[in-house]
Structures are given as C-alpha cells and as structure tokens.
Regions:
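Conserved C-terminal guanine-recognition region of P-loop GTPase G domains, centered on the G4
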Residues: 119-138
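P-loop/Walker-type NTP enzyme "switch/lid" segment
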Residues: 2-18, 25-99, 127, 167, ...
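Beta-strand-loop-alpha "switch" segments that mediate conformational coupling across diverse proteins
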Residues: 141, 151-183, 193-198
C-alpha cells in the first residue's frame, strides 16, 4: 500500500459479536498513543462505538478522539486534516452501510473469532468486497484446536491475515466504555502492522 492512500479503515464482518467495535476503538487508541490524529465513524445503527464514547465521557475519562455517527452518505467524507486516520465501525447487517464503509476505505479489517461460523461469514463478506483486506483473529486462545482449525481455514482459502492475533482476555471486555485498553491486548501490534502497510514504519 502507498502512504498517499486515504487513511480510512473499516472493521467488517456480517457476523455480530466478533469484536469489530473493540477493534475499532483499540486501534484508534493505539494510533493516538503514537501521536496520530484519529476520528471514529460509527455507521452501526446499534451505536456501539457511540455508546462506548458516551460511557467514557460520563466516567470523566473521555476518549482522546471524536466518535461521529455517520451514514452511507457521510461515512466517506474527507477529514479536515488529510493525515487523520478515520476508523469505521460497521454493523453486522445492513449491507448498504457496510458497502459504503468499504467503498470509503483503503483497507478493510475482516474481524473474526476462530469459530467456524464466524470464519465462514467472514469469507463470504470478503468475497463481496473490492478492497485490500486482511483478517484479524480475535478472542483467540493459543494451543486450542479451534485456533489451529482457523489458521488451516485461512491457509486453505488463501486468505491473508494480520500476524497479530487478539487474545481472549477479561481485561479487553472490561475496557469497554473506558479510554484505556490493556497493554497486552495486541492492538498496539495491529497498529504497527497497519503503519507498515502504509509505509510509515
């Protein structure tokens, strides 16, 4: 990828509960920690990212970036500063919203747990997008059959993934609605891989 590409990234899977919002917020926090400007756009009618931001603000520790509600018409609007990273949280359904988010993005993060149903839904989603994409495995447990099967599934279907995998951690669940993500979540490493893809590391 080129460092001249718009810095738009969408977290996508038509299966719910795989960690799209956590990935969006976790990556945004990691980018801010490295000194980058970030904006999150929430196109999910359930408003999970928006709710996260509201909870953090009510707790007195607001997120260090804006979370904007967006729709299919506004999700691709360029930020005021072209160096701003725009991370898009998408719904598990509403194909028009997912399509608009994908169309606006230079990179699609296909978020999936190692579960077979989640992987199959991810692969189906991948076949319908026309953007550079990479799978991010979440809620993983090292040494398990499910993780080995997931890696074999991706290899068999020739689907690329992030080297980093997000572990199943109680700390990640507890981070919901806060402005702090535990250091060992893996999102810092995911962010480093993203920056490498843009030629910024």
């Amino acid at each position: 990828m080129s460092n001249t590409l718009p810095r738009f990234i969408a977290a996508v899977n038509t299966k719910g509960g795989v960690g799209k919002t956590t990935t969006t917020i976790g990556t945004a926090l990691a980018l801010v920690k490295l000194g980058y400007a970030v904006e999150v756009r929430d196109v999910d009618p359930q408003g999970s990212a928006t709710s996260w931001a509201m909870q953090a603000r009510q707790a007195g520790t607001p997120l260090p970036f804006d979370v904007r509600v967006a729709n299919r018409m506004t999700v691709g609007e360029p930020p005021a500063d072209p160096d701003t990273w725009v991370l898009i949280d998408t719904p598990p359904s509403q194909s028009d919203l997912i399509g608009a988010a994908v169309d606006a993005s230079s990179l699609v993060i296909l978020v999936s747990t190692p579960g077979r149903l989640d992987l199959e839904r991810m692969a189906q989603t991948r076949s319908n997008i026309g953007r550079a994409s990479s799978v991010l495995l979440t809620q993983t447990k090292q040494g398990t059959v499910s993780l080995r099967d997931a890696e074999a599934f991706l290899t068999e279907h020739r689907i690329g993934r992030f080297d980093t995998m997000i572990p199943f951690r109680e700390g990640i669940r507890r981070a919901t609605g806060t402005a702090t993500m535990p250091s060992a979540t893996g999102y810092g490493s995911v962010t480093y891989e993203i920056l490498q893809a843009w030629g910024l590391r």
